[in-house]
C-alpha cells in the first residue's frame, strides 16, 4: 500500500516520540482499571463523524469515468528494447534492483527513530536492520507489522508467555517513562521469518518461485554479500504489468477472468465496521496479515485497513483512534488521502469474479495493495448493527453465494465446483483491551455515514500478490511450493506472543494471504 509523501509531519513532530505516544495507555490503565461496559448510542456519540473529502472536493474525473478506467486499464503495448525478445526467466534480478530502496537502521537505534525512517521509505514499506552502523549485511527488517507488534505490547493488548512477562513489562514501562526502546530489545517479540537473499546475477525465475511460494520480499546482494537492493512482490508484479507485451506466456493470462483462473481464496477473515480499531490491529498480528477487509452486518465491503495505516497512529493526538471504530478509522484514512494529499478517495480495493486478471493486477499496482477483495452484487445492510459474528458464516445461508464455475481454463484448475465462500468476522468481545486507552470510550461511526459505503458488494473471496505470482510461476512451468506453509509460519510466529488466533472458530483450511 502506498504511503503518501515522506510523512514530514511525523518527522517534524519528534517531540511526541512513539514511546511517549504509546505510553499514555499504560498510565491510564493504573487509573481506570477496565473499560466501561456502558456504550452510548450512535446518535449521542457520533453526531459529527469526520467529513469525507468528497463533501468539499470535486474529483477531476467523474466516478463513472474512474470506474471505466479501472475496468479497461491501459497497458503498454510497445515492446521495451531492454526486454524485447528475451525470456523473462533469464532476466537477472539485479536489473530490477533500485539502490535507493535500501534504507538502514541498526539494532541499537530506538524504535522511534526506526519508525521515522520507515515512514519515509514508502517504496518497500521496510527498513533493513544491521548489527552496526557501518555494516552492509542485513540481519533483519523493521516493517509496519513489527510496529504493530510493538504497539500492541505497549497499549496492553499483548498477552506474553510466562517467560516473556518481564520483557513485556520492561518495554511498556520504558515507553511510559519516555525512555527510548532499542530495536535490539524488541527482537524477541517480533519473531521474524528468516531473510531470503538472491545474488544480483540470479534470474527472475528464482524470484517468481519464491514469491509464488509466499515470500514477500527478497534481498539482492553483490558478490561480497552486501545488500544492493530489495525486490518485493509488488515491484515484480509491477514489472510484469508494464512489460507483459514482451512476455507472451504472461500476457495471454491478462484477458482471463478470475472465475476461470480459479485463483485466490474463498475463505476470508474480516473485521466488523463497528468494532474497535484495536481489534483489527490485533487480528492482523495474530493471523499474520498485512491488511484486512472491513465489512458491515450484510458482509458488504466498506473499506480496507492495512498495517501501513499505522503511520496515522504515531502521534499522541491520534492514539484514541485505537478505541474508535474501524469505520471511523476508514474515514480518517479517506480524509488523510483526499485532503492532505489531494487524492480521490474512490474505493478500488475490490474486484468481482468476472474481473479480468488485467483489471485485478492494474488495481493492485495502482493502489500498491497486497490483496484485492472479491465481491458479489451489493446487498442491503441492516439499519441496526447486530452482534458481531464469531463463528464462520456460510454465505450460502446468510448472503449471496457465487455460482459454481462451469468452465475453467486456469493453471491447475478443474471442472468441479469450488468451495463455498466463508467469511469469518472478528468479534469485539474476546479481543477487547485489558487496559483502557486514553480518554473516554469512543463509539463507532455508522457504516452509512460515508458516501458510497455500499457500492462495492458482498465479500466472497480474496486475491493476493502471492496468488497472482503463483499463477505466473505455474504458467511458466515453475514449481513454487505451497504458499500456505509460509502463511502458517508467519501466523505461528505472530500469534505466539499475543492472543489465541481464530483457529477455534473456523475449519482447518489455512486462508491467510
UniProtKB/Swiss-Prot annotation:
Origin species: Podospora anserina (Pleurage anserina)
Family (UniProt): Belongs to the SDS23 family.
Superkingdom of origin organism: Eukaryota
GO biological process terms, semicolon-separated: cellular response to glucose starvation; regulation of mitotic metaphase/anaphase transition
Protein name per Swiss-Prot or TrEMBL: Protein SDS23
Keyword annotations of the record: CBS domain, Cytoplasm, Nucleus, Repeat
Subcellular localization, as worded in the UniProt entry: Cytoplasm; Nucleus
Gene that encodes it: SDS23
SMART domains linked: CBS (SM00116)
Protein function: Involved in DNA replication and cell separation.
Composition-biased stretches (Polar residues): 424-447
Amino acid at each position: 500500500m502506498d504511503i503518501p509523501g515522506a510523512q514530514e509531519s511525523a518527522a517534524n513532530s519528534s517531540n511526541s516520540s512513539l514511546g511517549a505516544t504509546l505510553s499514555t495507555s499504560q498510565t491510564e490503565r493504573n487509573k481506570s482499571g477496565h473499560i466501561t461496559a456502558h456504550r452510548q448510542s450512535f446518535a449521542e456519540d457520533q453526531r459529527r463523524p469526520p467529513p469525507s473529502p468528497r463533501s468539499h472536493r470535486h474529483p477531476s474525473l467523474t466516478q463513472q469515468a474512474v470506474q471505466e478506467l479501472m475496468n479497461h486499464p491501459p497497458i503498454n503495448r510497445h515492446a521495451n528494447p531492454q526486454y524485447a525478445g528475451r525470456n523473462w526467466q533469464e532476466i537477472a534480478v539485479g536489473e530490477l534492483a533500485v539502490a535507493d530502496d535500501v534504507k538502514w537502521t541498526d539494532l541499537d537505534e530506538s524504535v522511534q527513530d526506526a519508525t521515522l525512517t520507515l515512514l519515509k521509505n514508502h517504496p518497500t514499506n521496510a527498513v533493513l536492520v544491521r548489527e552496526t552502523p557501518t555494516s552492509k549485511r542485513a540481519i533483519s527488517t523493521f516493517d509496519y507489522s513489527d510496529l504493530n507488534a510493538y504497539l500492541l505490547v505497549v497499549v496492553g493488548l499483548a498477552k506474553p508467555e510466562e517467560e516473556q512477562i518481564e520483557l513485556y513489562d520492561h518495554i511498556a514501562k520504558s515507553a511510559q517513562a519516555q525512555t527510548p526502546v532499542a530495536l535490539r530489545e524488541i527482537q524477541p517479540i517480533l519473531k521474524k521469518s528468516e531473510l531470503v537473499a538472491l545474488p544480483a546475477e540470479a534470474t527472475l525465475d528464482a524470484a517468481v518461485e519464491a514469491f509464488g511460494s509466499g515470500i514477500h520480499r527478497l534481498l539482492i546482494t553483490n558478490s561480497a554479500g552486501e545488500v544492493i537492493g530489495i525486490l518485493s512482490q509488488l515491484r515484480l508484479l509491477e514489472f510484469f504489468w508494464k512489460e507483459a507485451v514482451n512476455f507472451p506466456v504472461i500476457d495471454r493470462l491478462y484477458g482471463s477472468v478470475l472465475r476461470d483462473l480459479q485463483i485466490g481464496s474463498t475463505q476470508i477473515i474480516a473485521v466488523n465496521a463497528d468494532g474497535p480499531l484495536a481489534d483489527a490491529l490485533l487480528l492482523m498480528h495474530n493471523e499474520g496479515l498485512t491488511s484486512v477487509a472491513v465489512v458491515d452486518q450484510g458482509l458488504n465491503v466498506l473499506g480496507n485497513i492495512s498495517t501501513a495505516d499505522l503511520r496515522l497512529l504515531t502521534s499522541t493526538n491520534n492514539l484514541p483512534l485505537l478505541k474508535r471504530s474501524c469505520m471511523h478509522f476508514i474515514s480518517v484514512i479517506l480524509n488523510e488521502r483526499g485532503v492532505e494529499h489531494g487524492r480521490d478517495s474512490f474505493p478500488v480495493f475490490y474486484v468481482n469474479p468476472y474481473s479480468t486478471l488485467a483489471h485485478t493486477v492494474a488495481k493492485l499496482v495502482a493502489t500498491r495493495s497486497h490483496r484485492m477483495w472479491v465481491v458479489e452484487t451489493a446487498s442491503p445492510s441492516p439499519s441496526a448493527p447486530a452482534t458481531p459474528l464469531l463463528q464462520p458464516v456460510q454465505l450460502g445461508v446468510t448472503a449471496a453465494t457465487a455460482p459454481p464455475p462451469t468452465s475453467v481454463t486456469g493453471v491447475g484448475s478443474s471442472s468441479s465446483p469450488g468451495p463455498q465462500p466463508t467469511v469469518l468476522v472478528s468479534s469485539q468481545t474476546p479481543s477487547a483491551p485489558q487496559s483502557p486507552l486514553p480518554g473516554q470510550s469512543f463509539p463507532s461511526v455508522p457504516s452509512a455515514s460515508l458516501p458510497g459505503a455500499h457500492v462495492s458488494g458482498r465479500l466472497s473471496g480474496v486475491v493476493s500478490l502471492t496468488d497472482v505470482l503463483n499463477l505466473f510461476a505455474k504458467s511458466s512451468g515453475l514449481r513454487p511450493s505451497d504458499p500456505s506453509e509460509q502463511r502458517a509460519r508467519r501466523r505461528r510466529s505472530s500469534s505466539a506472543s499475543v492472543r489465541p488466533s481464530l483457529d477455534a472458530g473456523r475449519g482447518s483450511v489455512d486462508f491467510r494471504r
